[in-house]
Curated annotation (Swiss-Prot):
Originating organism: Sparus aurata
Domain of life: Eukaryota
Protein keywords: Acute phase, Cytokine, Glycoprotein, Growth factor, Secreted, Signal
One record GO biological process: liver regeneration
SUPFAM superfamilies in UniProt: 4-helical cytokines (SSF47266)
Protein name, per record: Interleukin-6
Gene Ontology molecular function terms on file: cytokine activity; growth factor activity; interleukin-6 receptor binding
Gene Ontology CC, one term: extracellular space
Gene: il6
Similarity comment text for this entry: Belongs to the IL-6 superfamily.
Length: 225
């Protein structure tokens, strides 16, 4: 019996010595430091989900983006010349400063029915353009996402038939070239309107997130002994 105990304790001592000499292995599931240049930990970082309204505005703007190439290819003049054309009853712009998020959303919502009516003029003068129909396909979803983001949702009604007819009559001209330029200018102004609103809303959203992150920053307390 004593000899068996001696053998047991000798084996235990030898095993302990081997464990002290062996390099430490990470415990299964434990976090370890990555070697320099190893980016395997990046999959743990999740990207902030895109704002649904901003994402949809980008989709609509992607459709309108083709207008510049089409216009310059047809007329061989600079795209920004369209800003010089005066179009009555254009919706008010979305300013980048001194406007609350709610006011920006309301401004965007108010502009949609006006541009929907103006695009009928574009269809008449530029029947091959796909932009008016593509815009209408997304306009109802745009309204839903705008009102869903508002604190106090409001109802913006479409223009009445008499208002729409008056709007289109104000654009009419006997000059064919002028009518075509007016149609292209409407598309130019629509793009500018959506870009300004998207950028202003995105700026407000990032500012809101920045303030929320600062409010959640942990405070370290130091105690003196």
């Amino acid at each position: 019996m004593p000899s068996r105990l001696n053998v047991f304790w000798l084996c235990a001592a030898a095993l302990a010595a081997l464990l002290r000499c062996a390099p430490a292995a990470p415990v299964d599931g434990a976090f370890t430091d990555n070697p320099a240049g190893d980016t395997s930990g990046e999959e743990w970082e999740t990207e902030r989900p895109a704002d649904p309204l901003i994402a949809l505005l980008k989709v609509v703007l992607e459709v309108i983006k083709t207008h510049r190439q089409e216009f310059e290819a047809e007329f061989h003049i600079r795209y920004d010349v369209l800003a010089q054309y005066n179009i009555p009853s254009l919706p008010a712009d979305c300013p980048s400063t001194n406007f609350s998020m709610e006011a920006l959303l309301h401004r965007l919502l108010q502009g949609l029915p006006v541009y929907t009516a103006l695009l009928k003029y574009v269809e008449k003068e530029e029947p091959k353009s796909q932009i008016p129909s593509r815009f209408r396909q997304n306009s109802e979803l745009l309204k839903q996402r705008i009102t869903g983001k508002m604190r106090h949702a409001v109802q913006v009604t479409p223009l009445t038939s008499s208002q729409e007819q008056q709007l289109l009559r104000d654009l009419d001209s006997s000059d064919t070239f002028h009518r075509k330029m007016t149609a292209h200018s409407i598309l130019y102004q629509l793009r500018s309107f959506l870009v300004d609103c998207k950028n202003a809303i995105n700026k407000k959203e990032k500012l809101r997130e920045s303030r929320a992150n600062r409010a959640m920053t942990p405070v370290t307390l130091y105690y003196q002994s």
